[in-house]
Amino acid sequence: MQLDLLLTGGTVVDPSQNLHEIRDLGIVGGTIADLSESGSYSASKTIDVSGLIITPGLIDLHAHVYKRHVPLSIDADATALAGGVTTVLDAGSAGSYNFAGFKHDVIDRVETEVLGLVNLSCIGLVAANFGELMDDRYADPEGVVETILQFPGKAVGVKIRASAHIIGSGQQGWDNFLKAVKAARDSDTWLMIHIGECPMTLPEMIPHLQPGDCITHCFKGGSTTVLNEDNQVYPELIAAKKKGIIFDIGHGFGSFNWDIATTAIAQGFIPNCISTDLHQMNLHGPVFDMPMTMSKFLHLGLSLDDVIDMSTTQPAQVLGRAGELGTLKPGTVADITLLEQHAGQFNFTDSYNQIRIGGSKLTATGIVRRGKLHLNSNRLA
C-alpha cells in the first residue's frame, strides 16, 4: 500500500480501541489507512514521531470562535490547531438571528471542524456583558429549533448560560431555563447548561434534564457548585451522571476551582469531558489550551488514558459522532493529535488564582487535520 503520510514510532493512545502501544499510523487521501506494529509500507512522506503520543484529534467541547462578531471570541484555526484540537464545539456564541452568519464566516471557512450550539438568546453573545437574556424578548426557543433544522450537522444543540445575572432571578430565571429545555426537546437535540451563580440549585435542575444533556463548568467555585453544605457531591448529581447526564469541565476564566475538583474527584465524581471554554479573557492564562487543561487532570490523579478519553472518545459520543470523530480506526477521517509529555515542575493555575505544582505537562507538537500535517515546533521538521 502506498501511503501519503506515515507516522512511525509513536505511542498510540486511542481509548475508542483500548489501544496504548507503539504503532505506525498510515494515511491515504485524508483517511486513516492502517495502524500497524511494523512499518511495512512506503509513503510519500514519513515522519519519525518516536517519543510522542499519537491520539485521535482532540475535541474541545466548549470554546468561543465567532471571531470579529462576538467580542470575546477567538480565531478557531490560530488557537485550536496550535493547541492540538481538530474539532471545536462553539458553545452558543451565536443565536437564531446570527447563526447563519456564524456558519458563513467561520464554520464554512476554517480548517478546524467547527460545530455550534445555538444560544437561547437570539443574538447569542454579541452583548454578553449585558446579560443576553435579562430582557425576555431576546429568548427565542422557536428560532433555536428552526436554526437547528436549517443547519443539520452544524447546529447540533442548544446553549443557555444559567446565571442569575444572565437569565434573571426567580421566576424569570426558571422561565428562561425551561424555554431552553423545551428548545432542546423540540429540536430532538441536547442542552448544554452553563452553571454560574444560578437562580436554582443543581438538584432542582436535574429533573428537567435527560441523558445527553450537559452541565458545563462542573468544577466551578462560588455559591452554585457540585458540592452540598457537607462538602459532599450532591447524590442527585451522582445519580444523574449514572443516568447519562454529561458533566463537562469548561475551565474558562472563572469556572475551574482546584478545591472543588480535588474534593469531587476524591469522592469518585469524574467528569465526562475536559474542555477549555477558551476565549479572549483566558487565552493567555489561566486556560491557554487543551493540553494545559488536560495536564491539570493528570495532576489530579487521572491516568493519561482517562484524560485522553475525556478529550476524544467521550466528547465524540456527546456530539453523536462516535466512530467518526475521536478515534483512530482505519477508514475514519485522519484527524490526529501529536502530544509530548514533559516531566518537571510546572505551575497550574485555576480560575481563582490558586496554583498547584505538577510534575507532568502535555504540549501539542502538531496535528493532522483531514490528512494534512500541521506542526507547532521544529521537533519534527
Task: Outline where the language-model segments fall.
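His/Asp/Glu-enriched, well-ordered alpha-helical/loop segment
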Residues: 259-342
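Metal-cofactor-binding active-site regions of metalloenzymes
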Residues: 83-89, 93-94, 109-136, 159-162, ...
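Metal-associated gating/positioning segment near the N- to mid-region
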Residues: 41, 49-109
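Short, acidic/polar
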Residues: 69-77, 137-148, 199-205
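C-terminal cap of metal-dependent C-N hydrolases
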Residues: 10, 333-381
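Active-site core of metal-dependent hydrolases
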Residues: 164-284
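Hydrophobic faces of well-ordered beta-strands that scaffold small-molecule active sites
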Residues: 59-63, 88-90, 114-118, 156-160, ...
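Histidine-rich, glycine-flanked metal-binding segment
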Residues: 1-55
